C-alpha cells in the first residue's frame, strides 16, 4: 500500500489594505486584536500570551510588545493603514498605539470606546492596602 505523503495546506495570505486595531487595556493585562473593516480577526496578541506573568502584564512595555506582535501579523497580511479603538483604563493604552505606529502601520483614527455606565452596577469596594 502506498504511503500518503504528509501534505499540509499553506496559509493563504489575505491582502487587506486597511483594518481596525482593538486595544483592550485593563488594570491586569493588555490585549491587542487586529481585524479587517468588517470585524474578522486577522491577528491578536496579549501581554500574557507573550509570557509576562502577574503584575508585569499590566506594564506599558508588555503592551508595547503585544502591539508589535499583533502588528507583525497584520503586516504579513498586507495591511498598511489602521483605525485604533481603545477600551479600558489600563497603563498600556498609549504605549500600544505608539508601538503600532513604530511597526510601520499608518494610524488614521484613534477612538476611545471605553464603556461608561449611566449609574449601572455598584462598583467594587475600595482596596485598603
From Swiss-Prot:
BP GO terms, sorted: translation
Pfam families associated with the record: Ribosomal_S11
Keyword presence, RNA-binding: yes
Cellular component, GO, one term: ribonucleoprotein complex
rRNA-binding listed as a keyword: yes
UniProt keyword annotations, A-Z: Ribonucleoprotein, Ribosomal protein, RNA-binding, rRNA-binding
InterPro entries in the cross-refs: Ribosomal_uS11 (IPR001971), Ribosomal_uS11_bac-type (IPR019981), Ribosomal_uS11_CS (IPR018102), Ribosomal_uS11_sf (IPR036967)
Matching Gene3D superfamilies: Ribosomal protein S11
GO molecular function: rRNA binding; structural constituent of ribosome
Entries under PROSITE patterns matching the protein: RIBOSOMAL_S11 (PS00054)
Role noted for this protein: Located on the platform of the 30S subunit, it bridges several disparate RNA helices of the 16S rRNA. Forms part of the Shine-Dalgarno cleft in the 70S ribosome.
Subunit: Part of the 30S ribosomal subunit. Interacts with proteins S7 and S18. Binds to IF-3.
Family membership: Belongs to the universal ribosomal protein uS11 family.
PANTHER family xref list: 40S RIBOSOMAL PROTEIN S14/30S RIBOSOMAL PROTEIN S11
Name of the protein in its database record: Small ribosomal subunit protein uS11
Gene name of the encoded protein: rpsK
Amino acid at each position: 500500500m502506498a504511503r500518503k505523503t504528509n501534505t499540509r495546506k499553506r496559509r493563504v495570505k489575505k491582502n487587506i489594505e486597511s483594518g481596525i486595531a482593538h486595544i483592550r487595556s485593563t488594570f491586569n493585562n493588555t490585549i491587542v486584536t487586529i481585524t479587517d473593516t468588517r470585524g474578522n480577526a486577522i491577528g491578536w496578541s496579549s501581554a500574557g500570551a507573550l509570557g509576562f506573568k502577574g503584575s508585569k502584564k499590566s506594564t506599558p512595555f508588555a503592551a508595547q510588545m503585544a502591539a508589535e506582535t499583533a502588528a507583525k501579523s497584520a503586516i504579513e497580511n498586507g495591511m498598511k493603514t489602521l483605525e485604533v479603538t481603545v477600551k479600558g483604563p489600563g497603563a498600556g493604552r498609549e504605549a500600544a498605539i505608539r508601538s503600532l505606529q513604530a511597526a510601520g502601520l499608518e494610524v488614521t483614527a484613534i477612538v476611545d470606546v471605553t464603556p461608561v455606565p449611566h449609574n449601572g452596577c455598584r462598583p467594587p469596594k475600595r482596596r485598603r492596602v
